[in-house]
Amino acid sequence: MNMKKFASLLLALCMLLSMVVVANAEVAANEIKIGLICIGDENEGYTANHINGLRAACAELGIDASQVIYKYNTPETEAAYEAAIDLAEQGCDVIFANSFGHESYVFLAAEEYPEIEFCHATGTGASASGLENAHNFFAAIYEARYVAGVVAGMKLNEMIAEGKFTAEQAKIGYVGAFPFEEVKSGYTAFYLGARSVCPSATMEVKFTNSWGDLALEKEAAEALIANGCVLISQHADTTGAPTACEAAGVPCVGYNISMIPAAPNTALTSAAINWASYFKFALQNVLAGEKFASDWCQGYVDGAVYITELNEGLVAEGTAAKVAEIEEAIKNGTLHVFNTATFTVKGETVTTCTAYDTDGDYVPDFGEAIVDGYFAESVLRSAPYFGLDIDGITMVE
């Protein structure tokens, strides 16, 4: 075969291969199969927010709803492993899981199916797992918590001015799920936001030891109100706390979704994550056949976090303008949520802090978290690692 003929055949073969690659990419978009393992279902805010985010990402990428398989109400037990295996056996190309306790079970499945991408929300172990197909993702929700705290602080000021209570009685109640860093980071950010506009504010935190239990969250909110808390917020997944607030006439700030439908006369706003940001990122990489980072975290500047609509008839005058000001300051980097000049620990300013534990002994051993005078949250990994107990916040039984 002469060289000219060989070159022509080689060129034709290259063109054919290029068409096959393009065709495969197009088919992948139409045939990709996605799994989502959920701690709850569409009836609770946290999971509903994930479902809505995945649906939005799929719609934007031209992926049909029939290509997504959901595993609802999956507990943080061996059931999560079984769900992951079942999704893998059903041919999923990428599997997402949305609860902290799913992680070890999902990554166990990732070891068995290296050709499938496993993406876990709120977890901490992907980078240390050594698995190229294991990923953690979260968002800088502490930024939105801070903004929601500003909304709350302005409401406290309004109620103080109206004579409903004194400045010294401006006590916030916070219904937390577990005493984990994820929750601690959130309630601390919320408190700092509130105190930035209402300096006399204090806060009590009560844990339910459950991510989503409507009755326990309602009871916790009721107990905090009975203990003198005049505004309630939450890091818990149901409408339990807002329901208690609506019955008691106490203002509240929610999480995940707007709580105005559940508490139209008391809900101010909610801090929320735009999960579509990550779902789109991960799906685009899977569709392209590209490997992607083990950790992902984005915030206000990327549109990954926000506060839901303000209850205009209830929030204090000037709240919308203040929110816009604070959001812009966070985006342009002139406001750092965990500025060490704004809080103390046992009366002392924090100048150094080891970020988090890598060997499981619950003693932080990796990474300096204090950078340029602020605690740099979710930089060394996607999940929060703010573990400080700052002055002004008290835990209650």
Describe the residue ranges of each PLM region.
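Sec-dependent N-terminal signal peptides of Gram-positive bacterial secreted proteins and lipoproteins
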Residues: 5-24
